[in-house]
């Protein structure tokens, strides 16, 4: 199944700045890099961020967003000077994949109908037990795709 690419803005880079990835030193990657880490279930995002900081012997790391301890998923971790850029990821669009299990038989038409309600502008309130502040938020869901029922 093909997914449409959502472009928020187009820009070009001046070739006089920076260098090709193959010409960079490893220290450039460590001091200006972002690791897209697959956070396991269990530790907090802050703990995982601290592990990266300790393992790479860095003075500064920062993660882009918070995943609850029981949640798995991509946790972007900015290294050294790249921690400033992590703030941009917090407002960037995200894509989620989930697996649902129903406790009773539900007609496919009902699943598809309810799924459509979660496209467009939605209101979101984090659960009572959550790692983020429990404030009502507005989110835009650009598309939803059911891959298998």
Language model segments and positions:
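Catalytic/RNA-binding core of pseudouridine synthases
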Residues: 1-149
């Amino acid at each position: 199944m093909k997914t449409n690419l959502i472009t928020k803005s187009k820009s070009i880079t001046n070739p006089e700045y920076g260098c090709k990835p193959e010409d960079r030193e490893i220290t450039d990657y460590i001091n200006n890099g972002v690791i897209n880490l697959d956070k396991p279930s269990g530790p907090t995002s802050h703990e995982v961020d601290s592990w990266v900081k300790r393992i790479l012997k860095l003075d500064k790391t920062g993660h882009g967003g918070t995943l609850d301890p029981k949640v798995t998923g991509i946790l972007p971790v900015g290294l050294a000077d790249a921690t400033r850029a992590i703030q941009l990821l917090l407002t960037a669009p995200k894509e989620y994949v989930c697996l649902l299990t129903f406790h009773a038989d539900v007609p496919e038409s009902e699943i598809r109908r309810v799924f459509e309600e979660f496209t467009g502008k939605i209101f979101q309130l984090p659960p009572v037990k959550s790692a983020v502040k429990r404030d009502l938020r507005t989110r835009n869901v650009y598309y939803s795709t059911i891959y298998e029922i």
